[in-house]
Amino acid sequence: MPLTRFGFIVTGDDFVQRTGTERFRMKVVGVRSPEQGIAAAREMVAEGIQLIELCGGFSPVWAGKIIEAIDYAVPVGVVAYGPESITGMARLFPG
């Protein structure tokens, strides 16, 4: 089965954006906190999203919580940043 429905959750501001073609659809959801990512992921699964990617603002702990919250229904990946990005990421995502 080919990937035809992709979801991306980013921390920042609340928004929903959809784009795609007749053969591929993408939904991008912005959330203000990692906690809100759980509801966004559940909604994506309910809509038939086949794969969810989380922005680098989600820690491995939050990725695990989201995976558990959707009961492992679809694969969930996390964007990763190398050691050279640690200082910059700390400025963007304090605490």
Spans of features found by a protein language model:
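N-terminal basic/disordered segments at the start of proteins
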Residues: M1-D14
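Short, well-ordered coil/turn segments that N-cap beta-strands
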Residues: P2-T4, G48-Q50, Y72-V74
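Hydrophobic faces of well-ordered beta-strands that scaffold small-molecule active sites
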Residues: F6-F8, K27, E53-L54, V76-V78
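Short, charged/polar "capping" segments at the starts of alpha-helices
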Residues: D14-R18, I86
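Active-site mouth loops of central-metabolism enzymes
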Residues: E22-E35
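Amphipathic, hydrophobic secondary-structure cores in small proteins
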Residues: G37-P60
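Short, charged, surface-exposed secondary-structure boundary motifs
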Residues: A39, E84-A90
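Alpha-helix-loop-beta-strand connector modules within alpha/beta enzyme cores
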Residues: P60-E84
